[in-house]
Amino acid sequence: MISRASEYAIRALTFLAQQQSEDGFYLARDMAERLGVPAPFLAKILQPLVTRGLIKSQRGRSGGFKLADGKLATDISLYDIVDAEEHLGKIRKCLLGQSECSDDRACPLHQYWKRTSDEYLALLASTTLRELGHFCEQKPQSGYPCPTPIA
């Protein structure tokens, strides 16, 4: 239900949140290797997250990406991440392609989609990086977010 870009963005920010105590920057190519994702694609999808102020980037020898100053894993929801990649306002568009689909001018799927999309958006808004990190701590065998073992 989310794009590959959003999936990778969530995994990357989960990784950065787990590393936050080290207070260092991580190169996109190093994260990509650890996360098992294409490096050029990861570098591209991190940029909207920088623009939104969720992460900070720094060029140069000790550069890379990290959570933005003052941002904690509890501050960043999946909605924040996915919206940066996909502009979630588009989810409200009619499933059947009607130019106007509202309670007054509903398509056959309007009520179902309205309820489903509301639940989906609420789930994204109520789930934080901290919760994903907690899952990783409780279930390290899951391999999330890094399918590649740390050497």
Q: Residue ranges of each PLM-predicted region?
A:
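Minor-groove-contacting beta-hairpin "wing" of winged helix-turn-helix DNA-binding domains
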Residues: 61-69
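Conserved segment of winged-helix/HTH DNA-binding domains
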Residues: 70-96
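Short, hydrophobic-biased segments on the C-terminal half of alpha helices
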Residues: 13, 46-47, 78
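Alpha-helical residues within the helix-turn-helix
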Residues: 33, 50-51
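C-terminal regulatory/oligomerization modules of transcriptional regulators
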Residues: 77, 92-151
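A short alpha-helical element within helix-turn-helix/winged-helix DNA-binding domains
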Residues: 26-36
